[in-house]
A protein has these predicted regions:
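Terminal domain-initiation and capping elements
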Residues: 1-131
Length: 131
C-alpha cells in the first residue's frame, strides 16, 4: 500500500463559522468523490486557513462528515503579502494503490487560480467554470 497526497483549496466570502464549515465540507466531499477513496483509507488530513479566517476550525467539517477517527490538524497559513484572501487549503494523505499522477487535486471557487497545473476537470463541472 502506498501513501499519496491529494491537494485542494476553496475560498469563502466571509469569516463566519457556518460558511467556513459549509465550504470545507464542499471541498472534502468533492475531493473524496473525485479520488474515490473510503474514509478508512485516510492516513491524515491537514487544513490551513489564511490569517483572515478565525471563526471556525475547518477540521470540524470533517468530523461532521464522520471523519471522526481520522487524524485532523488545523493551522494558519503564513501571511504573505498579496496572497489569496479567505482561503482554506487541504492536504489529505491516503493509503491506495494509485500513482501520484492519478490523484485529482481540486481547487474550487476563487482558489481555482492557485494551481492550474494540478487541476483536473471535476465531474459535472462545465469547462468554462474549470478555467
Amino acid at each position: 500500500m502506498l501513501v499519496r497526497g491529494i491537494r485542494g483549496a476553496i475560498t469563502v466570502d466571509s469569516n463566519n463559522k457556518e460558511e467556513i464549515i459549509k465550504k470545507t465540507k464542499e471541498l472534502l466531499v468533492t475531493l473524496k468523490k473525485e479520488n474515490d477513496f473510503m474514509i478508512e483509507d485516510i492516513v491524515s488530513t491537514f487544513f490551513s486557513v489564511t490569517p483572515d479566517l478565525n471563526a471556525a476550525f475547518p477540521a470540524q467539517a470533517a468530523r461532521e462528515l464522520n471523519w471522526d477517527r481520522v487524524p485532523l490538524f488545523d493551522m494558519k497559513e503564513i501571511d504573505v503579502p498579496g496572497s489569496l484572501p479567505r482561503c482554506i487549503r487541504i492536504l489529505i494523505q491516503i493509503n491506495c494503490q494509485k500513482s501520484q499522477a492519478e490523484m485529482k487535486h481540486c481547487y474550487l471557487r476563487g482558489a481555482r487560480i492557485l494551481r492550474k497545473d494540478l487541476m483536473n476537470k471535476i465531474s459535472g463541472q462545465k469547462e468554462s467554470e474549470f478555467k
